[in-house]
Design a protein with these regions (language model features):
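Divalent cation-coordinating acidic motifs and surrounding scaffolds
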Residues: 161, 248-249, 292-295, 337-701, ...
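C-terminal membrane-anchoring or membrane-association module
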Residues: 24, 756, 769-792
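C-terminal segment of classical bacterial N-terminal signal peptides
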Residues: 18-26
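Small-residue hotspots
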Residues: 19, 111, 173, 324, ...
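C-terminal low-complexity, Ser/Thr- and acidic/Pro-rich disordered "stalk" regions positioned immediately N-terminal
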Residues: 697-762
């Protein structure tokens, strides 16, 4: 529903009230306008990164075939329901597992239709093809002593007639479970009646929805299976990853989304207990269909809970304006609307409210940011021979798929990606930005200019902000011989700060072939006299992801279920190597920033704290959302010299809380949703961190800044000799050179030509050990099981 409009959902609430299916107060409340907002995007996801669209997701199994559609008769002249063969609670009485004890039996029963899902409504193929009935006069207050449900799903088949909500019907059919059984499996199944005949009945008592204030446990949910519920109070969106693909929102009661366990508590038993509690407090709000909304005719249907101007962001609040049905789908109980909302957002049973945040203020006179820009590749898949991509609904490739390049496939996709990133960076208000996931064309094998993509980004930033506003720190003369296809980098505003000397790369073996090498750069504030009272060092980082275990990795790298995922020992070694590298700058204010692929209480973060680094990132903020859990993989650390200069540290929730539907990679996936390339929201999958420094209050004079910042791709020093093992450069003012592993000389750039637009990709294997953690914790009721997230 949209702000200030009286939708058909209002009329539906009034009608349901008249039939006795909703509290009268709901009908009154439904007429009150409210601010409503909702949001989305679609491929596979891993911890710390989102995947490309078009990845296949498991569909709900096909319903059992029947020889004929149920016979429907309209014998509406009966004065009273009369006797029935089998009451619904008897059909729902459990036998083995959660299965009905009457599976396979043919029965006749009576009920009031509380939810209706006609076959192929709105042209969507995978609909529920049936309706829900509930014992006349049942419902009302929650009953902890309830032994069996008073409601039942009736499968009508693809050609069967579905009675209207409020109709009282007598149904004959065969009792079954869908999927087939839970007797030997953990996931719940739906008890259903495959109808063979249906007749209308008059004189039935109305059904009353049962109020609920939280998520029922599995034991509580089974005796309320398929019954009409009235969720009360405020709920919060904790996950929207599937909203544009399967139409679901993951909700939790209260006013805050769920947190990632190891962002709050220590790994191990505490994290397992925390995640078990999380799992017990989340339930999906479905859209009344099983359709994959990224496929076929479904791409023409409007999303249930997501629209331009109404982004259903993680953290937005939800209130229920109408009843829902509690039923198991895909192994978990969900709140199912009483009719299909996919294609009919006006039928939504909920009101969603919230507001997108503007860039925050942090104070100080100099601001530093760190931003993972989701595989910004200026080399494109379309220009790589044999490269394929993930298609939009027209079949046009949007993002590269298993190519040398990552990121955007087409020029249009790259333009969308770049526009959002430029909008976000220019809105940050930062003077220095450490970037992660910038293309390294040399490592990709598509060029000799290591800075080509970085220069392209600065060119785009200056086109939007004004010529000369931004410059980039060029690669140092000596760079590692073995690098990743993505790298870290620095850009800065040349009117306020300038680099001091050459940057320095930490080529420790802990990073080689496993992650991106850290990059250090000293900066000085520029004043009218071209000097500043203090300089500072920033070290950009991008540690190994959680998603995979490299071949030959040692002990401590396989996910052991403690909540830290894969490659934890590798990340600890990287943290220790970083601490050793950064120790050389102990006499200067120094910040460690970037994507550490570790939550706040995990071992790599503790290793840096043990080494004396203050973890100054904002407590309780979240730079990333994975599987409905919010936490920070991106961090800021300060040494003793930097702490007194801190004016503030915060995160801008511009990306992670947004639906992936607004990401450039999901452009053209739905006829009713634009990705909004003109704004910064969902410019990446990570939120940027922003740090305020106060440098004007004193301190020793800073070293003289470098005088020739790289502000344009055409400006570069003269070419250097093309030697693979260049001698070390002469000492300069700025960062002192450290011992590196195998290195090579960076080709200098006298004439830089813009690179042909090209690729995008991110840490291909980033994923969290949440599934293992859940298993170790004994699972939970309502973790939606439809999703398999990978990074391709």
């Amino acid at each position: 529903m949209k702000c200030g409009t009286r939708s058909l959902a209002v009329l539906g609430a009034l009608a349901l009230s008249a039939m006795g299916l909703v509290p009268a107060a709901w009908a009154a409340d439904a007429g009150q306008s409210g601010a409503v907002e909702a949001s989305q995007s679609g491929a596979a996801q891993t911890e710390g990164t989102q995947a490309q669209s078009g990845a296949a997701q498991p569909e709900e199994p096909t319903q059992p075939a029947h020889s004929s559609a149920p016979e429907t008769s309209a014998q509406s002249g009966e004065a009273s329901p009369g006797l029935v063969d089998t009451p619904i609670p008897d059909i729902q009485a459990v036998g083995a597992g959660d299965d009905s004890a009457m599976v396979g039996a043919t029965v006749t029963t009576l009920g009031v239709v509380t939810a209706a899902y006609p076959a192929a409504e709105s042209g969507l193929g995978a609909t529920l093809d049936g309706y829900t009935i509930q014992t006349p006069g049942s419902g009302g207050a929650w009953d902890e002593g309830r032994a069996s449900s008073d409601a039942l799903f009736v499968y009508a088949g693809k050609n069967g007639q579905v009675p209207a909500i409020g109709t009282c019907v007598r149904v004959t059919g065969t009792v079954g479970e869908f999927p087939a059984t839970t007797a030997k499996e953990n996931p719940q199944s739906l008890t259903q009646l495959a109808a063979t005949s249906v007749s209308n009945v008059e004189g039935c008592q109305a059904v009353t929805p049962t109020p609920v204030t939280g998520v029922p446990t599995p034991d509580q949910a089974e005796p309320y299976e398929s019954m009409l519920l009235a969720p009360q109070g405020t709920w919060t969106i904790t996950d929207n990853y599937q909203t544009n693909q399967y139409g679901t929102l993951a909700l939790t009661p209260g006013e805050s989304p769920l947190r990632a366990a190891t962002d709050v508590v220590a790994p191990g038993a505490a994290a397992r207990d925390y995640e078990a509690a999380n799992a017990a407090r989340v339930i999906a709000l479905d859209d009344g269909t099983n359709t994959n909304l990224l496929n076929g005719a479904a791409t023409e249907a409007a999303y249930a809970y997501l629209a331009n101007g109404s982004p259903a962001r993680v953290g937005y609040h939800v209130s229920f304006a109408g009843p829902v049905v509690l039923e198991p789908r895909h192994g978990s109980f969900v709140f199912q609307p009483t009719s299909m909302v996919a294609g009919h957002p006006d039928r939504s049973p909920v009101t969603i409210t919230g507001q997108r945040p503007s860039a925050p203020a942090v104070g100080g006179d100099t601001r530093v940011a760190t931003f993972n820009v989701l595989n910004y590749f200026s080399d494109l898949g379309v220009d790589e021979a044999g490269c394929k991509g993930y298609p939009d609904r027209t079949g046009a490739f949007v993002t590269a798929k298993k190519c040398k390049v990552r990121g955007a496939f087409s020029r249009e996709a790259f333009a969308n990606q770049e526009a959002k990133i430029v909008s976000a960076i220019n809105a940050l208000g930062a003077d220095v930005v450490a970037l992660e996931e910038i293309e390294n064309p040399v490592a990709v094998g598509v060029g000799m200019d290591r800075d080509a993509s970085l220069a392209r980004l600065v060119e785009a930033l200056n086109k939007a902000a004004g010529s000369g506003t931004w410059a980039y720190v060029p690669s140092p003369q000596i760079v590692p011989e073995a690098e990743d296809v993505i790298r870290v980098a620095f850009i800065y505003k040349s009117a306020t700060v300038a680099p001091v000397g050459e940057s320095l790369i930490d080529d420790d073996p802990a990073f080689t072939g496993l992650a991106r090498q850290p990059l250090a750069q000293e900066f000085a504030r520029v004043t009218a006299e071209r000097s500043a009272p203090a300089s500072f060092v920033v070290i950009a980082n991008h540690f190994k992801s959680k998603g995979s275990v490299p071949e030959g990795a040692g002990e401590g790298n396989v996910d052991n279920g403690d909540g830290q995922g894969n490659a934890n020992a590798i990340r600890v070694a990287q943290a220790q190597a970083l601490a050793s590298f950064a120790a050389r700058f102990s006499d200067k204010p120094t910040l460690l920033v970037g994507d550490f692929n570790s939550y706040s209480q995990e071992d790599p973060i503790k290793a840096l704290e043990t080494a004396g680094w203050a973890h100054v990132s904002g407590a309780g903020e979240a730079s990333y959302v994975y599987s409905g859990r919010s936490g920070s993989l991106d961090h800021v650390f300060a040494n003793a010299a930097a702490k007194p200069l801190l004016a503030g540290v915060t995160s801008w929730a511009v990306n992670a809380q947004e639906s992936i539907a607004f990401e450039y990679s999901r452009a053209g996936m739905n006829a009713h949703l634009a990705i909004e390339a003109d704004n910064p929201y969902r410019s990446s999958d990570h939120n940027p961190e922003l740090i305020g420094l106060t440098l004007s209050g004193g301190g020793e004079p800073a070293p003289t800044p470098s005088t020739n910042p790289s502000t344009d791709p055409s400006e570069a020093p003269s070419p250097a000799p093309a030697s693979s093992q260049a001698p070390s450069p002469a000492p300069q003012r700025g960062l002192s050179q450290g011992t590196t592993a195998s290195t090579r000389t960076t080709p200098s750039r006298q004439t830089r030509t813009p690179s042909n637009l090209a690729r995008t990709g991110t840490d291909a294997d980033r994923a969290v050990g949440l599934g293992v953690l859940l298993a170790a914790a004994g699972g939970g009721l309502l973790l939606v099981a439809r999703r398999v997230r990978r990074r391709g």
